[in-house]
Regions:
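C-terminal subregions of glycosyltransferases and related glycan-biosynthesis enzymes
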Residues: 215-318
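Nucleotide-sugar donor-binding/catalytic module of glycosyltransferases
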Residues: 1-237, 241-242
Length: 318
């Protein structure tokens, strides 16, 4: 068995329908230099059994939470147990592509950078199962073409990759900067991603697709519940806090790029939901956020397309 150089942290709660595919995608990696920490976050379905059976393999370690604590706390608990030089994350409803770890480990090992970022695609439900979509433009902008030893200032578009997974980083980097995920809220990875970019001495990006991000057929994932007010509050807070991290680091170009992407990609679906939502609080939160970002965009000369601008102009009157 190869000596592990990377720990894969896999948190999950009630993901029995998807966890077997996630774990199989890890076992099928072309690289064998990994170990994994599974975090069962208070599951009440078969996730506990699936994780327990996986842990019979020495490469897997299992952490159990009797009471759900959320993704942030689950990832933090696993981070405390990492003993390998490198660490990465995979959500238990997503999948790795076969060469994911090989490409990420090779890149960061050869470059000496603090972190490396890969591309990802959506897995969407189809007639005969899940169908892999294309690399979206904002994902491609952050990871293509390949770069080694770059920085956020040199490559501000990398700030558009705000997920915990699809990256590999050095555990020493986490511990040197006391990086932790916020606990008790959703979209906890956005602010951590921006902190990583602002703190990294060097960043690698590769255009290779390393993760398939699942859109669950049953609509049960957090990102599929943006019509709920509590989810909206955490979502808006995460986006706002992420931009604030960039501002605090004087990363003006990256902050402007992030504002543009939020206005172009994140806010239009929220505006459409708000236009028919039965809770006036939802519309008020979206309207406040749109006005805040629009003012910021005007000051930074950030442009969005005509259709998006019309939608945002209407929302700014709420």
């Amino acid at each position: 068995m190869s000596t592990p150089v990377v720990t894969v942290i896999i948190p999950g709660r009630d993901v029995a329908a998807y966890a077997p595919d996630a774990l199989e995608s890890l076992r099928n990696q072309t690289s064998t230099q990994w170990r994994a920490i599974l975090v069962d976050d208070g599951s009440i379905d078969d996730t506990s059994r699936i994780f327990q059976e996986a842990a019979a393999d020495r490469r897997f370690e299992l952490i159990r939470h009797d009471v759900p604590q959320g993704l942030g706390a689950s990832r933090n608990a696993a981070l405390d147990r990492v003993e390998t030089p490198l660490v990465t994350f995979l959500d238990a409803d997503d999948e790795y592509t076969p060469h994911a770890l090989e490409r990420l480990v090779t890149t960061i090992s050869e470059s000496g950078s603090d972190l490396a970022v890969g591309a990802y695609v959506r897995l969407r439900p189809g007639v005969d199962g899940y169908v892999e979509g294309p690399v979206q433009p904002w994902v491609a902008a952050s990871t293509s073409p390949a770069r080694r030893g770059t920085t956020l200032r040199e490559h501000p578009a990398v700030s558009g990759n705000i997920v915990a997974w699809s990256k590999i980083s050095r555990i020493e980097f986490w511990r040197r900067h006391d990086l932790r995920f916020p606990e008790g809220r959703m979209y906890e990875d956005q602010v951590v991603a921006q902190r990583m970019y602002t703190l990294a001495r060097a960043i690698d990006v590769i255009p290779d697709v390393v993760v398939r991000w699942r859109e669950r057929a049953d609509g049960s994932s957090i990102t599929q519940h943006k019509d709920a007010v509590d989810v909206l509050v955490d979502y808006v807070t995460a986006m706002r806090d992420g931009v604030a991290v960039l501002d605090a680091a004087s990363q003006r170009t990256a902050a402007a790029e992030r504002v543009r992407l939020i206005l172009q990609m994140d806010t239009p679906p929220l505006v459409r939901i708000a236009s028919t939502h039965d809770d006036p609080a939802y519309r008020r939160i979206v309207g406040d956020f749109v006005r805040e970002l629009a003012a910021r965009a005007d000051g930074d000369a950030v442009a969005v397309d005509t259709d998006t601008k019309g939608l945002l102009d209407a929302a700014s009157l709420w």
